[in-house]
Amino acid sequence: MDAWPRCLERLEAEFPPEDVHTWLKPLQAEDRGDSIVLYAPNAFIVEQVRERYLPRIRELLAYFAGNGEVALAVGSRPRAPEPLPAPQAVASAPAAAPIVPFAGNLDSHYTFANFVEGRSNQLGLAAAIQAAQKPGDRAHNPLLLYGSTGLGKTHLMFAAGNALRQANPAAKVMYLRSEQFFSAMIRALHDKAMDQFKRQFHQIDALLIDDIQFFAGMDRTQEEFFHTFNALFDGRQHIILTCDRYPREVEGLEPRLKSRLAWGLSVAIDPPDFETRAAIVLAKARERGAEIPDDVAFLIAKKMRSNVRDLEGALNTLVARANFTGRSITVEFAQETLRDLLRAQQQAIGIPNIQKTVADYYGLQMKDLLSKRRTRSLARPRQVAMALAKELTEHSLPEIGDAFAGRDHTTVLHACRQIRTLMEADGKLREDWEKLIRKLSE
């Protein structure tokens, strides 16, 4: 196809030559009409492309070919084009082509079995399992998973969809990104086929939509989604959604839609703690058949605090360089390989950023947060900021104390212990902590 060479030419201008040579040039493209399949010689390249380049590839192919629906597969491009497979997620009218294109097939790689559980995602995992086991149950319909990018929301959504299909292979499970819902609706409006559009959605057993925050400000899209939601909910078909924040915090979402989203169960997915991050690194390494010493996993987990995607990116970089150079993966090798990545991560979450974020969150002036005043309205946010600095940076206690108007390191230590103790009993403080972690990890 002509579009792929043009896409590759643009990618060569945007990414380092060694990356293009290693991950992108081995790909072979096949145009299937409603989708484009990129074939890679092995699963490792598929994973690299999915994690690092797929969003940009979709954008470029949408521009050059008018088609941004891309699937990745292991193998070689068939000599003769294969017929487009029937959409697994769409129930179409017998005599009409589906309005919703071949998009959103569930990725079978993502299951509950390979999801790494931790304190930050326990409730989300339990809720997704319940949704898969009891589809349509009003206690968790809709199920809304919210949190920053790269924390595992889509993994849980795919896992629930795959579990639904495993329990009932005939189940019509549709997964779409929010922009795909929008595009399908626009196409239906253009083709004067809104009845068919509605019929397709109303006939499915479960609807999974990613990133509903992008519906904000799209009045007609929200109206159609509102009616689709009502029809599915009334029919006891399950709805699973993700959002990058709690929906009531999304400006531009209609109040009636926010109200509907609150009918079921909303669960926050928070950044993983150190133990979970280390477990994720080790689990992802095993998936790739790579030998990663525990101390290397601990190093990555300690330095990369923001999200799972960054952990995987660091691991992929490490494994790829080890394969290219033939060197063993050691702590020294990891520090050398990830030096720039770790430095950027450290700079992104610095003490000044933490102080400003905490001050803004509690509605304080920076000078008050750093002052010597000990009123409760100032002391508690100040302790939270100190504890976050200890949690999210590599600074020592004395360095943190210096950044807080020259306080003693024992004051910082007391603040850290105090906040940890209070969070066990104070749900509001725990919620504040988790929200601040999410803000600082974005």
Curated annotation (Swiss-Prot):
> Residue ranges of region Domain IV, binds dsDNA?
323-442
Instruction: Name which cysteines form disulfide bonds.
Output: none
Cellular localization per UniProt: Cytoplasm
Q: Which GO terms describe its cellular component?
A: cytoplasm; plasma membrane
The UniProt keyword set, sorted, is: ATP-binding, Cytoplasm, DNA replication, DNA-binding, Lipid-binding, Nucleotide-binding
Show the SUPFAM superfamilies listed in the entry.
Answer: P-loop containing nucleoside triphosphate hydrolases, TrpR-like
Q: Which Gene3D superfamilies match?
A: 1.10.1750.10, 1.10.8.60, 3.30.300.180, P-loop containing nucleotide triphosphate hydrolases
List the InterPro entries hit by this protein, alphabetically: AAA+_ATPase (IPR003593), Chromosome_initiator_DnaA (IPR001957), Chromosome_initiator_DnaA-like (IPR020591), Chromosome_initiator_DnaA_CS (IPR018312), DnaA_C (IPR013159), DnaA_dom (IPR013317), DnaA_N_dom (IPR024633), DnaA_N_sf (IPR038454)
Query: Region labeled Domain II — which residues?
Result: 75-104
Superkingdom to which the source organism belongs = Bacteria
| Molecular function as annotated in GO | ATP binding; ATP hydrolysis activity; DNA replication origin binding; lipid binding
| Protein residues bound to ATP | G150, G152, K153, T154
Q: Which family does it belong to?
A: Belongs to the DnaA family.
Domain annotation text? Domain I is involved in oligomerization and binding regulators, domain II is flexibile and of varying length in different bacteria, domain III forms the AAA+ region, while domain IV binds dsDNA.
Q: What does this protein do?
A: Plays an essential role in the initiation and regulation of chromosomal replication. ATP-DnaA binds to the origin of replication (oriC) to initiate formation of the DNA replication initiation complex once per cell cycle. Binds the DnaA box (a 9 base pair repeat at the origin) and separates the double-stranded (ds)DNA. Forms a right-handed helical filament on oriC DNA; dsDNA binds to the exterior of the filament while single-stranded (ss)DNA is stabiized in the filament's interior.
Q: How does it assemble?
A: Oligomerizes as a right-handed, spiral filament on DNA at oriC.
What protein is this chain from? Chromosomal replication initiator protein DnaA
Query: From which organism does this entry originate?
Result: Xanthomonas campestris pv. campestris (strain 8004)
- The gene name on file is dnaA
